Amino acid sequence: MILYEYPFNERIRTLLRLEDLFERFTFFVAQEDAREHHVALTTLFEISEVAGRADLKSDLMKELERQRQTLAPFRGNPGIEQNALEAVLGEIEQTLANLAQMQGKTGQHLIDNEWLASIRSRAVIPGGTCKFDLPSYYAWQQWPAEQRRHDIAKWAMPLLPLRDAAMIVLRLARESGQASKVMAMQGSYQQMLSGRTYQLMQVRVPPELRVIPEASANKYMLWVRFTAQDGDVRPRAVDIDVPFQLTLCNL
C-alpha cells in the first residue's frame, strides 16, 4: 500500500516538513561523495529555516508536556504494558529536558558562522557554489568523507532536540488512529466528522491502481478525490470505484 498523509493544521504541517527534511539529511550525510554532502548541508539550511519558526519549540514543549500528563496516570495500571509506557514517558521526559537546554534562536549558530553563512547565501543562486565562487568550500569538499561527515553532524547537533520532539509527536499522532476500509465511489469519497478535531489523515491505496488521492477537510466533513496521471499531462479525475484505507489521527 502507498501511504499519503494530509495535515489538518499548520503545526502538523510543519512537523511533517521537518520529518521529510531530516530523512533527506540523514540519507545524504551517510553517503561518501562530496556532492551528496553538499545536499546534506543545504538540507540542513532548510531545516534551520523551518525550525526557526518562533513558536515551534514552545509548541513542542507544550504538546510533550500534555502527553506526559496524559500518560503518567497509567503507571501501575495492570491493563497497560508498563515497560512500553515507561519507555515512552522516559523518551518524552528526556526530550523535554533537551528542549529546555536549547538556548537562543533556533539555528542561530548557523547564521553566526560566517563561513556557513557565505555558503548558505550562495547556495540559493543556481550554480552559485562553484569552486571559483567558494574556493574554501571546494577545499573542504576535498577532505575525507569522515571528516566532512563529522563537521556536518556538529552543525546539526543543536537542532536534534527539535527533531526528536517532532518525531515523538508525529508517532503518537499516527498511533492514535485506526485504519478503516472504505470505498470511493466513482473516485470520490466524503465523510462527516461530527465536529471532532483531527490532526492528521492517512490514505493508503493499492499501488496497482495507480491513483493519486487529493484531500481536503473542515471541522464538519472531509473529502477524498482520486486522480490519475499518465506521462507529463496534468492529473485527471478518475470515475472508477477505488478501495482504500482511511485513518484519522487525533492526539
From Swiss-Prot:
Interacts with FtsZ. This is Cell division protein ZapD. The lineage of its organism: Bacteria, Pseudomonadati, Pseudomonadota, Betaproteobacteria, Burkholderiales. It is found in: Cytoplasm. PANTHER family: CELL DIVISION PROTEIN ZAPD (PTHR39455:SF1). Belongs to the ZapD family. Keywords: Cell cycle, Cell division, Cytoplasm, Septation. It comes from the Bacteria. Cell division factor that enhances FtsZ-ring assembly. Directly interacts with FtsZ and promotes bundling of FtsZ protofilaments, with a reduction in FtsZ GTPase activity. One of its GO terms (cellular component) is cell division site. NCBIfam families: PRK05287.1-4 (NF003656). InterPro entries: ZapD, ZapD_C, ZapD_sf.
